[in-house]
């Protein structure tokens, strides 16, 4: 191990000497027609049509073949320039930081976990806790039966640090013998990297990974102790996900520079532990160091509600997808069923007509609008009225609508103040601001979210708003039913870590202000 670490250190030292100049080089992936890279435009169109029809909801898609982007699309209001939260796909980036720290000789796979935290380790650690190593954190074999109860939803209710909470949590199994998908274990990896480097994982990866790959201002949330969350909370753009996949596809090599030791890439993406036996499940193919093994001899990082970086070495391909889905296997099945058969070994004849069809379809992608009319006979009579609600857990005190202006507007009043949400008609209108729809406390939702809204009268007395948090997988469908002096407000999310349907609110009209 010592000899391997020394070899890694030499690689990293050479990298850091040249990194400053290299980081200035454009990292954008080249573009190509699908046919030049062995894929039919017609087959790609079939994939996009199926994704748009059957998946609710795709947010973005980038396909890279032979190092070239051959197709890319964003479902409006999502766009290429807005970062998207990755959830557990963040884990693969934390793994990369661990690999680089090992390469620099700052830690090893066999280091005891508790050795890094003498002040937060229980006075009499159990045999299994003492036996836990860095490699056990990486391969989700910590010996825990349940995840440590870290309060990511409300850190103020947790008195111990996240590290201390993990270390005092029960370890009933011998580390290395029991697979448990374990986000607090990834947080511990982040904490260890910060201990040995003096930098957060985010700052540590900036010159070593993010800048060389051309990532623009990646954002990563932290614990109350100022440690990068590690397991989740990284936000980047879809092409940046694809570049990360390309880096791993090419064993850590990028534009002629070895950013990550090839030996680490091999270890991280190989099976380090078995995690199931279902042949058709992409969650039962084995687990590496914060990477999943997948069918078709491939591997991936993935995150909640359908964030994917799929790497398919045998086809020299990377698929980057962001989405907001409940069934993540459905999206992977679509890739296996539609994209894999489309990838041929050699170039195909150009098909300009099919390519134009594909490009037009990609340019027109959008999250589906609510169906209904642009106006109602009630529009003028309810416009400007305030509907007040009894105290509720969502913190909404009152709402009002402006239907008389050219731009319909929803005004929401909470204890924090008043927010105006511009609503498009068969288009998306975007703005930033607080909007209490029950998602603010959900993991990784920005404090000042980018909100895109569109609306329609789904019936004569019901106005339906679809509200997308465009840096996340989330959208909410809000139904406002006007019934005389009453307003019945129903809301449902596409996905959530808890209930998707929120408690109904009943509002009562008061005098116009």
Across the structure, where does each feature detected by a protein language model lie?
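A short, well-structured edge-of-sheet supersecondary motif
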Residues: 48-79, 316-319
């Amino acid at each position: 191990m010592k000899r391997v670490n020394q070899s890694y250190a030499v690689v990293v030292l050479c990298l850091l000497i040249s990194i400053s100049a290299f980081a200035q080089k454009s990292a954008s992936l080249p573009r190509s027609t699908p046919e030049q890279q062995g894929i039919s435009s017609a087959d790609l169109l079939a994939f996009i049509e199926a994704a748009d029809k059957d998946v609710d909801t795709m947010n973005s898609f980038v396909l890279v073949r032979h190092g070239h982007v051959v197709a890319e699309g964003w479902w409006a209001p999502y766009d290429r320039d807005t970062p998207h939260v990755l959830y557990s796909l963040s884990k693969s980036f934390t793994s990369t930081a661990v690999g680089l720290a090992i390469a620099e000789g700052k830690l090893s796979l066999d280091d005891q976990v508790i050795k890094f935290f003498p002040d937060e380790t229980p006075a009499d650690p159990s045999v299994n806790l003492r036996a836990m190593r860095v490699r056990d954190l990486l391969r989700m074999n910590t010996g825990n039966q349940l995840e440590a109860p870290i309060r990511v939803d409300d850190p103020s209710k947790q008195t111990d640090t996240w590290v201390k909470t993990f270390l005092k949590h029960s370890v009933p199994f011998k580390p290395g013998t029991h697979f448990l998908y374990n986000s607090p274990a990834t947080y511990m990896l982040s904490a260890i990297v910060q201990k040995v480097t003096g930098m957060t994982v985010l700052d540590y990866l900036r010159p070593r990974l993010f800048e060389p790959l051309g990532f623009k201002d990646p954002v990563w949330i932290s614990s109350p102790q100022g440690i990068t969350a590690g397991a989740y909370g990284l936000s980047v753009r879809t092409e940046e996900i694809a570049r990360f996949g390309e880096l791993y596809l090419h064993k850590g090599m990028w534009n002629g520079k070895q950013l990550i030791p090839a030996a680490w890439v091999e270890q991280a993406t190989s099976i380090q532990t078995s995690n199931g036996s279902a042949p058709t499940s992409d969650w039962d193919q084995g687990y590496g160091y914060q990477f999943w093994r997948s069918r078709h001899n491939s591997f991936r990082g993935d995150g909640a509600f359908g964030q994917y970086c799929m790497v398919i070495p045998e086809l020299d391909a990377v698929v980057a997808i962001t989405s907001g889905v409940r069934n993540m296997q459905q999206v992977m099945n679509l890739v296996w069923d539609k994209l894999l058969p489309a990838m041929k070994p050699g170039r195909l004849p150009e098909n300009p007509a099919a390519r134009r069809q594909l490009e037009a379809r990609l340019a027109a992608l959008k999250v589906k609008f609510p169906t209904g009319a642009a106006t109602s006979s009630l529009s003028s009579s309810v416009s400007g009225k305030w509907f007040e609600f009894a105290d509720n857990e969502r913190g909404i005190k009152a709402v009002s609508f402006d239907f008389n202006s050219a731009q319909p507007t929803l005004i929401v009043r909470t204890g924090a103040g008043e927010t105006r949400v511009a609503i498009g008609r068969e288009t998306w209108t975007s703005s930033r601001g607080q909007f209490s729809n029950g998602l603010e406390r959900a993991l990784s939702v920005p404090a000042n979210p980018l909100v895109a809204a569109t609306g329609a009268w789904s019936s004569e007395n019901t106005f339906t708003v679809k509200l997308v948090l465009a840096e996340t997988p989330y959208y909410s469908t809000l139904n406002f039913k006007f019934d005389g002096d009453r307003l019945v407000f129903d809301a449902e999310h596409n996905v959530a870590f808890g209930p998707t349907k929120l408690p109904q609110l009943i509002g009562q009209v008061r005098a116009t202000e």
